[in-house]
Amino acid sequence: MAVQKSRVTPSRRGQRRSHDALSAKQLSTDPTTGEVHLRHHITADGFYRGKKVIQTKTSAVEED
């Protein structure tokens, strides 16, 4: 088993952990539907940047 040569100081420990922080997800609002979605992802309704890009099951039911 590996054993450290000397005790790690709180400063050194903090420097090692400096990249471990979580960041909040970036959310956007679609201009057409007003739906909130992740950046660079389509909405649940199939819209991306205000345009319909994919046919969804819910929209197919509404059209029938």
Curated annotation (Swiss-Prot):
GO MF term set: structural constituent of ribosome
One Pfam family in the UniProt entry: Ribosomal_L32p
Similarity remark: Belongs to the bacterial ribosomal protein bL32 family.
Highest rank taxon of the organism: Bacteria
HAMAP family reported for this sequence: Ribosomal_bL32
Any one of the GO BP annotations: translation
Name this protein carries in UniProt: Large ribosomal subunit protein bL32
SUPFAM superfamilies: Zn-binding ribosomal proteins
Coiled-coil positions: none
A GO cellular component annotation in the UniProt record: large ribosomal subunit
Keywords in alphabetical order: Ribonucleoprotein, Ribosomal protein
InterPro entries according to UniProt: Ribosomal_bL32 (IPR002677), Ribosomal_bL32_bact (IPR044957), Ribosomal_zn-bd (IPR011332)
Region (Disordered): 1-36
